[in-house]
Structure formats: structure tokens, C-alpha cells
A protein has these predicted regions:
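Extended, charged catalytic domains and RNA/DNA-binding interfaces, predominantly
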Residues: 1-322
Length: 322
């Protein structure tokens, strides 16, 4: 707090540039794909330092002002066992196989079996090489949170503790990055293995608020959600109510519209009069897992639908910042 009070704020405000969706080697999908940058190294890279990964030097060029490393919560315990010397479960032969994946075919097979098929199944769970909740706790506190603390430079570079809740019911992406405003964080993240129901995520977030946490969830990839992101029914199959709208808008004040899986704001097929609607449409995402795009998958549609809810319910579940 003493450090923070020494920071001079501009009363006219400043523009800051950062990132809330960063994956490192502690995300299983990234590790399978060859990522070996740690959370600590990711923060250093964001600040402009040279970082050597897989034998190659990398530099971001222009440093960022703030970053949240948001690795997938679902398998960070497994990745802790995989990478931290002496960690519980690290000698599991399956993890030795994971550490030594070579070909694209081997990587694809691991990704489909332990990430895609598991996460999108009826009952997602930990793989057989999970060594228990203490590894998840260690990955969260000793790696993720520690990296955020160690790289925080008040007034110069802001780190934000966070993680990704990676639910994919019915193969529809319902992913959210959960970001904490300070270090009043839980001992364990709430992952999609605890529940793939976003309403239960919000209930958990409400419990954290009661304990003093300040947090929000940032949805992304609505284009790949199969319509679930902006569905007119709650998870009990009932029409959205004012209470639902208020709860959602309380915790989900922002939405991520652009990332590697494409643009979730708009699509040229549905807004042909918009000359910029063809940017990063990522049609390949629409052809994967039966996710043929519909207008209702996109943020622009949700923004207008939210006005309807405001008129009918007195509350808007889709009043997002972009």
C-alpha cells in the first residue's frame, strides 16, 4: 500500500496498453504445442526484457503497461508436476512422455485426448497423471501468484493475478478469464472441472467477494460458443430474469472480442454492409466441432439484444466494455 500511495495519478487519465489473456507452459495445451515460457518469463518479456525460450531469444519490442497471465486452471497442477523439479507426480511415465513429444502427430494426439475430448465430455475430469490438489495449489500460489508479485512495479508495470476458466459444454466455448484486482485471492482457482456451469462460477465469485476479493470474469470466443454465450435461457432452461442479468453484468463487465481464434464482434456474412466486417473472421473455427457461425454468436448481436433486455427487465446482461 505504501508503494501504491507513492504513485502519482494523472487526473486527466492516461491510456495504458496490456493483455489479459496470456498462456505459458503452465497451460497444458500450450505446453503440448511447444511453449516453454514460464509465467515469470512472460511478465519479463512483457516489460521489454530479452527472454530465451527453446533456444531462441525473443523481445516484445514495445513494453506493455499491464499484463495478466491467465493459464488454464483445469490442468495447472498437472503442469506443475511436469515442470517443477521434485514436484509430486513428476516421475509419472506419462509425464515423461509429455515432456518428450516430438512430432506434430504426437502433439495432436495428446491435445485431442487429454484436452479436447476430456474438457468437452459429459463429465470433464483430471487425467490419470494428476497428482492431487496440492499440485494445483502449488501451481497457483507458488508459480502464478508469486510471478505476479515478483514482477509488479507500481507506477511502471502492473501485474494482475488471474486464470482461465475453460468450460466447453456440448463443445461450445464458454471460456472466461477470471482476473483479481489485488492479492486477496483464494487458495485454489475454481475451474471447469469444479463446474462447467457459468452460473456456478458467478456464485463462487460472489463468495470470494464476501471474503474481500475484487474480481471479474472476461468472456471470450463467443464465435465458438455454439450460441451458448448469449443464450436466452439460463442453465435451468428458464428465460433470463432481471436477477440473472444483474448478476452477470456485475461480474462480466468486459468481453474480449479479438484473439487468435478470430473476431467475435462481427462477421461479414451477417453484417455485409460493414466494410470492416471481414477482418479476422476465422471461418475455420466455424467449421470445427460443428460450430457453424450464426449471428447470435457475435458480440454486436448481443449488444443490441442487451438493449431489449434492459427495456423488458430493467437490467442488461450484455452491457460490456470492449
Amino acid at each position: 500500500e505504501a508503494l501504491e500511495t507513492a504513485v502519482v495519478e494523472n487526473p486527466l487519465k492516461d491510456a495504458y496498453f496490456g493483455e489479459t489473456h496470456v498462456h505459458t507452459s503452465f497451460s497444458m495445451d500450450a505446453f503440448i504445442g511447444g511453449a516453454r515460457i514460464t509465467p515469470d518469463e512472460a511478465y519479463k518479456l512483457a516489460q521489454g526484457a530479452d527472454v530465451v525460450v527453446n533456444g531462441q531469444k525473443h523481445n516484445i519490442g514495445r513494453p506493455l503497461d499491464w499484463v495478466a497471465v491467465s493459464d488454464h486452471a483445469e490442468f495447472i497442477g498437472e503442469m506443475y508436476s511436469t515442470q517443477v523439479p521434485g514436484a509430486k507426480g513428476g516421475d509419472n511415465p506419462m509425464l515423461e512422455e509429455l515432456r518428450n513429444l516430438k512430432s506434430v502427430d504426437e502433439q495432436r494426439a495428446w491435445f485431442l485426448k487429454y484436452v479436447v475430448e476430456n474438457n468437452r465430455g459429459e463429465n470433464p475430469g483430471h487425467p490419470p497423471f494428476y497428482a492431487g490438489p496440492e499440485t494445483t495449489r502449488s501451481a497457483w500460489k507458488d508459480v502464478q501468484i508469486k510471478a505476479a508479485i515478483d514482477n509488479y512495479r507500481p507506477g511502471k508495470f502492473t501485474t494482475l493475478a488471474g486464470y482461465e476458466w475453460t468450460a466447453a459444454p456440448k463443445a461450445g466455448n464458454m471460456h472466461r478469464n477470471v482476473i483479481f484486482r489485488d492479492l486477496n485471492v483464494p487458495d485454489m482457482p475454481f475451474s471447469a472441472l469444479d463446474s462447467a456451469d457459468e452460473e456456478k462460477l458467478w456464485a463462487w465469485m460472489a463468495e470470494q467477494e464476501k471474503k474481500g476479493s475484487r474480481l471479474l470474469a472476461i468472456p471470450h470466443n463467443s464465435n465458438g460458443s455454439k450460441g451458448l454465450m448469449f443464450e436466452p435461457l439460463d442453465n435451468a432452461g428458464k428465460p433470463i430474469t432481471a436477477d440473472y442479468a444483474r448478476l452477470r453484468s456485475h461480474f462480466e463487465r468486459l468481453i474480449e472480442m479479438m484473439q487468435i481464434k478470430g473476431n467475435s464482434e462481427v462477421h461479414r456474412k451477417f453484417w455485409p454492409a460493414d466494410e470492416f466486417a471481414g477482418f479476422e473472421n476465422a471461418d475455420s473455427v466455424g467449421s470445427f466441432s460443428g460450430r457453424e457461425f450464426k449471428k447470435e454468436y457475435f458480440v454486436r448481436w448481443a449488444a443490441t439484444k442487451g438493449l431489449d433486455y434492459q427495456a423488458k427487465l430493467g437490467a442488461n446482461p450484455y452491457q460490456f466494455g470492449f
